[in-house]
Amino acid sequence: MANILKKIYDNDRRELKKFEKLATKVESLADEYEKLSDEQLQAKTPEFRKRLEKGETLDDLLPEAFATAREGAKRVLGLYPFRVQIIGGIALHYGNIAEMMTGEGKTLTATLPVYLNALTGKGVHVVTVNEYLSSRDESEMGQLYKWLGLTVGLNLNSMSADEKRDAYNCDVTYSTNSELGFDYLRDNMVVYKDQMVQRPLNYAIIDEVDSILIDEARTPLIISGQAEQANSEYIRADRFVKTLTEDKSDDDADDDEDHGDYKIDWPTKTINLTNQGIKKACEHFGLKNLYDIDNQVLVHHIDQALRANYIMLKDIDYVVQNGEVMIVDSFTGRVMEGRRYSDGLHQAIEAKEGVKIQEESKTQATITYQNFFRMYKKLAGMTGTAKTEEEEFREIYNMEVITIPTNRPIARKDLPDILYPTLDSKFEAVVKEIKERHAKGQPVLVGTVAIESSERLSKMLDQAGIPHAVLNAKNHAKEAEIIMNAGQRGAVTIATNMAGRGTDIKLGPGVKELGGLAVIGTERHESRRIDNQLRGRSGRQGDPGVTRFYLSLEDDLMKRFGGDRVKLFLDRISDNDDDKVIESRMITKQVESAQKRVEGNNYDTRKQTLQYDDVMRTQREIIYGERMQVISEEKTLKPVLMPMIKRTIDHQVDMYTQGDKKDWRNDQLRDFISSAITDEETTKKLNIKHLGAEELKKRLYKIAEDNYAEKEKQLADPEQMLEFEKVVILRVVDERWTDHIDAMDQLRQSISLRGYGQLNPLVEYQEAGYRMFEEMISDIEFDATRLFMKAQIRQNISR
């Protein structure tokens, strides 16, 4: 372990040395660039762009580009980046995390690599945790980029697609992490390419990177729509299906007539309407062609109603309890609480059983921040606290954490923790401490882990007659204003962890002499990083300050880890209950070792989430890639559709013609041909009993090719034909993909139950997920075949 730590430390120093050399080069250009006129300095941007076109790299341009942005900042913003900010900027350019203490000017630091990377014209995203910070930084730092001839955009949730597209087409775009992720998902749901708003993801600098890539790493971004099926549709389909009779005739029967409306293939648990059943459906619903494009949703309802009524068995596959349909686990025979069948099957069973049909929202697209940000060509981040999570950043995001030296030495005093036996005694001591510091005018910032603690403390301060402000991370703009004033003489501010993050606390007049900002932590967070963030609120840019944590044996962390050992220690050193207070480095060490354990557990959980999510990531990339090919195609999709149709024919014919000819399932084969490939009359003429499997395939290929040619003739305009092909593929892919997301989610919830014996749940999930993906692809090809072959051409086709 010691060797690993030494290796990391040496690497850190090596990188810093390299960056220091580059920073010296940037500084050496300062005098020369200071002498340039505004016009000459502004002319550097087109000059750099030309040099990039001629083959120079961003690394080649770094010293000059940084010197340009630095001099520009002095003229436009009245701010001149220090040497340490240049080093931070270099770390960011090379795709690292720059750990910079609070107040060291992270926002200004980012302008240097943003300017350099924006010269490529491929787009730089500056990512913040909320829209207040995005708007603030865009309006302040944006002045510099515009002055240097770059375009700057702000991407907000309230914007239209056109406004978003304009923002993304700028050289520099400010946005929140959530809006970037949602725009990516929405772009992969559009039906026309020109509806997309984002360009390929090039370079991002994430502010408060630990908050986004660690604290929110497991939060999935989800776009969901109300499942479009109205409950009445399930009931209509159910009523129709209940009128049907089963065709139980043997496959070897000599006649080609149907002996019922649907046929079940029990080995594969599939059920299909016979030609007789298809005719009945057309009569019942008043349709000419059941399998026309416009009837796709109805066909889906009928399919699910058939499965619900004739394949899913009550008290075997499911039970009805208290008016609800509950799934039974086929392995254990136990009812699975809270689980539902996907793809509308659960609602179809509810319709069958006459219980209340529950509406479901359907996930149409989802991604985690971990996987979204790993798609950028280059990623960098800034924060005051990242070193404790260094291993995670390296392993998951391939980013090194570089600790940037402070511009001035840190003068803040971090006092040892104080421990009390109860919450009451702890909070009384906190109020006493605030009272004493407030009396002499020293500003106090009190950090709490939970909103309840904030409210409890606020009441106690009211009773003590101490004016104060409370922040609970709800109103970002108002919070920023309160936090800015938290360093004024006599200010008392209570804040939960995240409140006001991203805004500096500057000391008011005369506060330095009073000892600077006093920070009081009322509890240790389970992550050392969050505690360090609170400490870092004080002592910015070499200011004086003091920090201390007040703990009690009733705090969550103390109860979970090491509370008993500390209690014994407390009992030994103090006889008098009221005086059981210890101020000791031992307590601090005990707490930190507990925090390390929690951090380790949390990291393992996030790592596991990523391993599971990687299965979906691979599948999502395949589907989104194929989808992009479809919407980008400008000539014909025949090379995509015809192989789909042929693979479907191969798969279905092979499935029903296994073994000797006497074992062939001719009825199911006929049903497939007449429902998905051609009409009933042509199916009869094929006389499939007298054909071999390969000969049958050839004849079906010919029917498909003729059908294609006929449609091309009917739609003489190639653009109309292309539009028709796109309609077929996109409708099927989108419907099947959203069903698959749902099914994968169900699988993930159930897979943990299978983690018994020697089975590894992750391997189980990967294998089952792969099988389900293969099945989905097969379903897409089958549906596209049926939709294309059976659709009746109309001129007014639209997606």
Curated annotation (Swiss-Prot):
Residue ranges of the TM segments: none
GO BP terms: intracellular protein transmembrane transport; protein import; protein targeting; protein transport by the Sec complex
Recorded GO MF terms: ATP binding; protein-exporting ATPase activity
Presence of keyword tRNA processing: no
A Pfam family: P-loop_SecA
Residues holding ATP: Q85, G103, E104, G105, K106, T107, D504
Function comment: Part of the Sec protein translocase complex. Interacts with the SecYEG preprotein conducting channel. Has a central role in coupling the hydrolysis of ATP to the transfer of proteins into and across the cell membrane, serving as an ATP-driven molecular motor driving the stepwise translocation of polypeptide chains across the membrane.
Protein name: Protein translocase subunit SecA
Organism, as annotated: Lactobacillus gasseri (strain ATCC 33323 / DSM 20243 / BCRC 14619 / CIP 102991 / JCM 1131 / KCTC 3163 / NCIMB 11718 / NCTC 13722 / AM63)
